Amino acid sequence: MPMERFLKDFTIPEKIEFLKSQDDGSYGKFTIYPFERGFGVTIGNTLRRVLLSSIEGYAITAMRVQSNNKDSSSKVVSSEFDLIPGVSEDTLEVIANIKNIHLKLREGEQRKTISFSVSGKDTNVLKASHFERDGVEVFNKDLVIATLSHDVNLDFEFQINYGRGYVSSEQNSKYLEEVNVIALDSIFSPIEKVSYSVEDTRVGQRSDYDKLVMEIWTTGVISAKDAIKKAASIVREFLFPLVDFEDSVSVSFDKSKSESSNLLDMSIEKLDLSVRSLNCLAKENVRTLGELISKNAEELSKARNFGKKSLEEIIEKLGSYQLFLGMSKEDALSVLSKNVKISE
């Protein structure tokens, strides 16, 4: 039976009602109907799982804390089990509070390091609002991070990254080069809670159709409306290859061509470069593989804080994919079309 005729026998949802009760869009209630019986649960459960697991967001992945004393001496907190001088809470509690900060970077930025100092003479409480810098927006500004004594002076440095799901401190520590930097567990998901229910609804003479009611709560980093759109797009992308799977030969051939082109738009973060190299490239507005290979070694060497070690690392990483600095786009596409597996 042709696909078009097959779908005509199904009742497809025609109405989506959206209720927003928060000014920032962090809560949304969606009523979608009508579905054929059983499809409400299928679609609702699928969207819920994708929303909770696969929506990307921002998290603090590492921190460095230094205490400055009156006698000009200083102490750097070496691990999560070391105490922060002048702070009432232990370091583990401070870290737990930091992981609850809801923030995001400026559009297009995926990595940023922020630094600031706090004196107990100015404030006795470190709050999430202290993390708000140029290019960093914080959504729960009143969250208390730590309680400070009057004579404490602290210097903080934090690494903010863009990602998905949960990343352990062990994984984050692989990208740290400096000593006395504490890697943190990171929860990138901006989704706080998702619930759904299925009710009966009437279509014509039949009252056994499904009405799907979904409620989404976010941290404010993304609106509930954008979150459900993104989740639906993710599901669609995963199911799309199954639609024409009988044409696997031609699909595979086309995919090889298009995927090699798409790889030039791949984020340089997927090259597993060191934090230092990534930061230097970001300052030069190099964010994709295509932008990286368009640069030559001389251009990169002139970048501030870009050393020989970083250059050697980049050359080695590109070489593992048979690419090199100063390579033309045409040559790169030719190489990548024969080796599209590097995106997997």
From Swiss-Prot:
One of its GO terms (cellular component) is cytoplasm. Disulfide bonds: none annotated. Residues 1-246 are annotated as: Alpha N-terminal domain (alpha-NTD). It catalyses: RNA(n) + a ribonucleoside 5'-triphosphate = RNA(n+1) + diphosphate. InterPro entries: DNA-dir_RNA_pol_insert, DNA-dir_RNA_pol_RpoA/D/Rpb3, DNA-dir_RpoA, RBP11-like, RNAP_asu_C, RNApol_insert_sf. It comes from the Bacteria. Keywords: DNA-directed RNA polymerase, Nucleotidyltransferase, Transcription, Transferase. One of its GO terms (molecular function) is DNA-directed RNA polymerase activity. The keyword GTP-binding does not apply. It is an enzyme of class 2 (transferase). Pfam families: RNA_pol_A_bac (PF01000), RNA_pol_A_CTD (PF03118), RNA_pol_L (PF01193). Residues 259-344 are annotated as: Alpha C-terminal domain (alpha-CTD). Homodimer. The RNAP catalytic core consists of 2 alpha, 1 beta, 1 beta' and 1 omega subunit. When a sigma factor is associated with the core the holoenzyme is formed, which can initiate transcription. DNA-dependent RNA polymerase catalyzes the transcription of DNA into RNA using the four ribonucleoside triphosphates as substrates. The N-terminal domain is essential for RNAP assembly and basal transcription, whereas the C-terminal domain is involved in interaction with transcriptional regulators and with upstream promoter elements. Belongs to the RNA polymerase alpha chain family. This is DNA-directed RNA polymerase subunit alpha. It comes from Borreliella afzelii (strain PKo) (Borrelia afzelii). The lineage of its organism: Bacteria, Pseudomonadati, Spirochaetota, Spirochaetia, Spirochaetales. The gene is rpoA.
